């Protein structure tokens, strides 16, 4: 409406959070410093009107300087310590009027643990200086460690594929990119292990030409023992040890009987004899097939059977015995009695007296041929015709004349 005053208005500013008192100082410390300054000014010249006007002018200049400091303060200014020339402005900021800071809604900002107060209420930054980042060392070539624990074999850097996009002809960049650092670049290269699982090839033997040898130091993990262990486990070594032990026992018995001066020559002669016998036994034994079979037959256990001789242990009372044979008549009579027992006929059976003849059981013709050339239905045949057919003999199958139509 025209003539109506607008109650509120707004404007666009560059920093909308400019008036939120975003500083790190404690407002209570600022108030305390302002009170101390007032007391000092009041003690110097007891309150005239000139002193009051001077105090008000100083407070106004201090508030203006504090507003400018709050607007221009940034994150870099907080991290870096201020030069001593700015300390004068900080003192002026601390002498703000207490009425402006007692408004409601102002957030109390506490000091951080790395800051301390001096006696006059000034904040001191005691944060440790940050050390600069480490530099990567590209000049020093990586050395690989050999078995002996010394870095003796140098592997050239060119042989290793450089990770990332830009490599020497490898990766995405190709030759044109050169030594450029790409995504996932790592100057250390791929880690090469001394041993690979399931193979006897070590990483440095491929480049240095050294031959791989198993770990046989006699101690530690994944150890295959020493060369002396194999000699001690061989049967020849065990046999020698047994012979040496026996010779030592014999030597000890001889030394008890003989004086001390004669101990060594007796032991030496016995050892020499044992060595000569061992040399003779070591050669392979050769024999013929017959000799080998003879040795096998000696070792084989012979099986002996207790075989009874004929008529051995026979009783004399059975010498006159003979075999009894049944007569044929008795066998035939026995068979007839068995048949009569199973197939017994009654007395009034007349089946044996009847004669049974099987005639032609085919159906008779239902009609004959008509007299006028047509096929007519004949009458019923006479009863006498059946007797004629039954009395007629069957044709001979083997006679070709009986079947003239087939001829």
Curated annotation (Swiss-Prot):
Q: Among its keywords, does the record have Phosphoprotein?
A: yes
Biased region (Polar residues) positions are: 242-256
Origin, by domain of life?
Eukaryota
GO term, biological process aspect, one: negative regulation of translation
Listed GO CC annotations: cytoplasm; cytosol; nucleus; perinuclear region of cytoplasm
Spell out the subcellular localization from the entry. Answer: Cytoplasm; Nucleus; Cytoplasm, Perinuclear region
Tell me where in this chain the PTM Phosphothreonine is found: 226
The annotated crosslink position for Glycyl lysine isopeptide (Lys-Gly) (interchain with G-Cter in SUMO2) is 102, 211, 228, 280
Phosphoserine, modified sites: 25, 197, 199, 203, 205, 208, 221, 234, 329, 391, 393
Residue ranges, annotated region (Disordered): 33-227, 242-288, 327-407
Q: How does it assemble?
A: Associates with mature 80S ribosomes. Interacts with EEF2/eEF2; interaction sequesters EEF2/eEF2 at the A-site of the ribosome, thereby blocking the interaction sites of the mRNA-tRNA complex, promoting ribosome stabilization and hibernation. Interacts with SPIN1. Interacts with CHD3 and TDRD3. Interacts with ZDHHC17 (via ANK repeats).
Role of this protein? Ribosome-binding protein that promotes ribosome hibernation, a process during which ribosomes are stabilized in an inactive state and preserved from proteasomal degradation. Acts via its association with EEF2/eEF2 factor, sequestering EEF2/eEF2 at the A-site of the ribosome and promoting ribosome stabilization and storage in an inactive state. May also play a role in the regulation of mRNA stability: binds to the 3'-most 134 nt of the SERPINE1/PAI1 mRNA, a region which confers cyclic nucleotide regulation of message decay. Seems to play a role in PML-nuclear bodies formation.
Which PANTHER family does this chain map to? HYALURONIC ACID-BINDING PROTEIN 4 (PTHR12299), SERPINE1 MRNA-BINDING PROTEIN 1 (PTHR12299:SF29)
Question: In its UniProt entry, what is this protein called?
Answer: SERPINE1 mRNA-binding protein 1
Instruction: State the species of origin.
Output: Mus musculus (Mouse)
Question: What gene is this protein a product of?
Answer: Serbp1
